[in-house]
Amino acid sequence: QRYDRLESRYLTTGDFSALQQMNTDYPIETRTLIEKMLQLGTITDANISNRFLMFYQDSTLQALIADAEAEYANMEDINKQLKESFGRLGEWIPGLKQPSFYAQIGALDQSIVIGEHSVGISLDKYMGAEYPLYKKFYNAQQRKTMTRSYIVPDCLTFYLLSIYPMDDFDNRPQ
C-alpha cells in the first residue's frame, strides 16, 4: 500500500484532503507515524495536523521526501519479493498470519515499523549507501544496509522478531 504517496502529497503541498484520506484509509499507520515514530503528540490534539506539516517543512526533509518518491516510484520488484518471501515463510511456519505492507516516509527514524499484522517500510531509510544525507549521520558500515536490497530481509527479520522475540535482543552484540 502506498501510504507514502498520500503522506508526500500532504507534506509537500499542505493538501488537507490528503491528510483526511490518510486518517480515513490508514488510521493506524497515521497514528503510529505521528504518535510513536515522530512523537509529535496525540492524533486527537487540535493542532496536530499543523505540527505534523511543520515538522516536515525543513528543507532537508523536503528533499528527502522528493528523493524517496523518485527512488521508489516503482516498487513492483519489492512487492514481488515480499510476496514470494512471505509465501515461503508461510510454508515453513504453518498458520503464520501474512502481514499487510505499506510504505511511508519516517524522517530517518526507523527502517521497519511493525504493527498488528502490518509492516511499515520507511523508504527514507533505504535510499542507498551513497545517499549524500546519510554520509552526515551514518558510518559506512551502517550505510551498507540502507539499500533497496535490504528492504525484504529487514521486513522478514523484524516481523519474525515481533512474533518470536529474542531474550535481551537489544543488548546483544551485532
Where are these regions (language model features)?
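N-terminal mature-domain "stem" immediately C-terminal to a signal peptide or N-terminal signal-anchor/transmembrane
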Residues: Q1-F55
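Acidic/His-rich structured neighborhood in mature extracellular/periplasmic domains
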Residues: L53-Q174
